[in-house]
Swiss-Prot record:
The chain crosses the membrane at residues 10-30, 50-70, 72-92, 118-138, 148-168. It comes from Shewanella pealeana (strain ATCC 700345 / ANG-SQ1). Belongs to the YciB family. The keyword Cell membrane applies. It is a multi-pass membrane protein. This is Inner membrane-spanning protein YciB. The keyword rRNA-binding does not apply. Plays a role in cell envelope biogenesis, maintenance of cell envelope integrity and membrane homeostasis. GO terms for cellular component: plasma membrane. Keywords: Cell inner membrane, Cell membrane, Membrane, Transmembrane, Transmembrane helix. The gene is yciB. NCBIfam families: ispZ, PRK00259.1-2, PRK00259.1-3.
Length: 181
């Protein structure tokens, strides 16, 4: 259920874009992200920081898109969110308080050097995706960008998540791996 909830705003944005335009889709994205927060709170009695950050970014950049009737803002939102994630991960690693380890370290027990590699891998991933988003958003058609945002970035993120889990699993002790099964 939680994973479906994570994709709700993206699905609504895409569907509304296909039937209307980027501006109505941006408004729908704002509403869907707000709805995501409400549903998440009702179901889990808490709000995740990532959802809150995303909501603020969607609201700010979506509103600018609507008010100024300029789709550049909603396109930049993707890159800025990725940059914030990269910065948060990088700073947490530099401060020896890796976010990924704090989120997953209880279930996936690996050495700190492995968490560092995974963290820097994700920092690099977010930076590259942010840069590619800029290229696609401002060099190709709006429809190509929407498809890239919805399908390309989502697929890349899912693939990288699977690769990360496999890498972490391979670097776990045999005993810890057995406990997961």
């Amino acid at each position: 259920m939680k994973q479906l909830l994570d994709f709700l705003p993206l699905v609504i944005f895409f569907a509304v874009y296909k039937f209307f335009d980027i501006y109505i889709a941006s408004g729908a994205l704002i509403a869907a992200t707000a709805l995501q927060l409400v549903i998440s709170y009702l179901l889990y009695k808490k709000l995740e920081k990532m959802h809150l950050i995303t909501f603020v970014m969607v609201t700010v950049f979506g509103s600018l898109t609507l008010i100024l009737h300029d789709d550049s803002f909603i396109k930049w939102k993707v890159t800025i969110v990725y940059a914030l994630f990269a910065i948060a991960l990088g700073v947490s690693q530099i401060m020896n308080k890796p976010l990924l380890k704090s989120m997953l370290g209880k279930e996936l027990i690996v050495e700190d050097k492995i968490w560092a590699r995974v963290t820097w891998y994700w920092v690099s991933f977010f930076v590259v995706c942010g840069l590619v988003n800029i290229y696609v958003a401002f060099s190709l058609s709006q429809e190509t960008w929407v498809n890239f945002k919805v399908f390309g970035l989502t697929a890349l993120t899912l693939i990288n998540t699977v690769l990360t889990v496999v890498y972490l699993f391979k670097n776990m002790s045999e005993e810890d791996r057995k406990e997961l099964k």
